[in-house]
Amino acid sequence: MPFIPHTEEDVTEMLASIGATSIDELFDEIPAELKNGKLTQVPTGMSEMEISRLMYERAQKDGFYLSFIGAGAYEHHIPAAVWQITTRGEFYSSYTPYQAEASQGTLQLLYEYQTMMASLAGMDVSNASLYDGASALAEAALMAVRQHKSSRRILVPQTVHPIYRSVVRTIVRNQAIEVVEVPYDPATGQVSIDQLDQFAQEEFAALIIPQPNFFGVLEQVDTLADWAHDKQSLAIAVVNPTALAMLKPPGEWGRQGADIAVGEGQPLGIPLSSGGPYFGFMACKQELVRQMPGRIIGRTTDLEGKEGFALTLQAREQHIRRSKATSNICTNQGLMVTAATIYMSLLGPEGLYRVAAQSHANTLALVEQLETLPGVKKAFHSPFFHEAVLQLSVPADEVLNKLKAQGVLGGVLLENYYPDLKNTLLVCATETKIAEDLDKYTEMLRQILKA
């Protein structure tokens, strides 16, 4: 199929076929007030060299900041080999591998990805990815309701990423599913067990458990998972994959382990890229696999007894079940998964652990240094991973603006999401930061507070 514009002859023939004399007549049913008219702001055409120069000049305006922002998207070192391999022609495609005999390389890579993610999460099975961490959590909520059958209510702690909570509400609200929020303990920054107990006599399909939570704090995951199971609810873990290299996997939480684990895959070799594309991951227990959305790759043998890979359990998917499918996931984020698989393969378990350990150590060191400054203290007294909340004695938004003016992105202003957390910053320091970076942040903040 040639991808070229229609000729005048093509347009005339198509208009004649539908009984219209012009393209304007074709669209005359659109009210005039809704039509944009001429695109007067579109400039004249430019040469390739002119466009390259313009883009370079605009890129220079972005500046190069020292970033201590996390909140769901993290600056990690990505080995050069990751994207050098990912962008090879064999991988660099959005093709869905329906035709197994022609897609063994892609299918094997996806199978290896599933194996790695299932191992990292301590689960039985993983799918081949979802769109992002937020929509993966929404899919997990839908999955829990399908499995539970008798309840259409989901318990969501306020310590879950606020954007994730918003996405979950958006996706489930038209399916008669109620999202009930659980307050956090203002002293610890964790899910309040006392607040949770007020729902003890009510029925819920699932309890969502973040680890670490949006504040960077480590939750009491064993207690929370057991609470959910004691109430015959499913436990849904929403986790940072980097943290899983150090922390107990969801499959080992409490007496039974979490039932579903989801999260954002961006830390696994995906650049920040102004917010995307990223990918979501999902893993679950074997008994829930038929409720799982998205592609699942299986290993099998062909007629000659040779090992091969193919899409499996396809009866769950939209190209077969249509409206009764478990989701409308299409080609999903295959290229991002390719990069993540290569990233995990290159680093291995020991490398992933070093990334996690150094990120934790850097954030711990940063918080300790900043707490020596008058007017700075931790907002919560709980263990954290590679993010922490700092309480300032001065307006935090002004501090961030002054830091930015000096080339430092100092964190996330939490009162935008939590109005009660006035003058608090969520700061993050991954393995990409060195001692000089931490010292620079500390000294700049010292000068700002002194002024």
Curated annotation (Swiss-Prot):
It holds the Pfam family GDC-P. Its EC number is 1.4.4.2. The keyword Lipid metabolism does not apply. GO terms for biological process: glycine decarboxylation via glycine cleavage system; nucleoside metabolic process. Keywords: Oxidoreductase. It is an enzyme of class 1 (oxidoreductase). GO terms for molecular function: glycine dehydrogenase (decarboxylating) activity. InterPro entries: GcvPA (IPR023010), GDC-P_N (IPR049315), GDC_P (IPR020581), PyrdxlP-dep_Trfase (IPR015424), PyrdxlP-dep_Trfase_major (IPR015421), PyrdxlP-dep_Trfase_small (IPR015422). The glycine cleavage system catalyzes the degradation of glycine. The P protein binds the alpha-amino group of glycine through its pyridoxal phosphate cofactor; CO(2) is released and the remaining methylamine moiety is then transferred to the lipoamide cofactor of the H protein. This is Probable glycine dehydrogenase (decarboxylating) subunit 1. The gene is gcvPA.
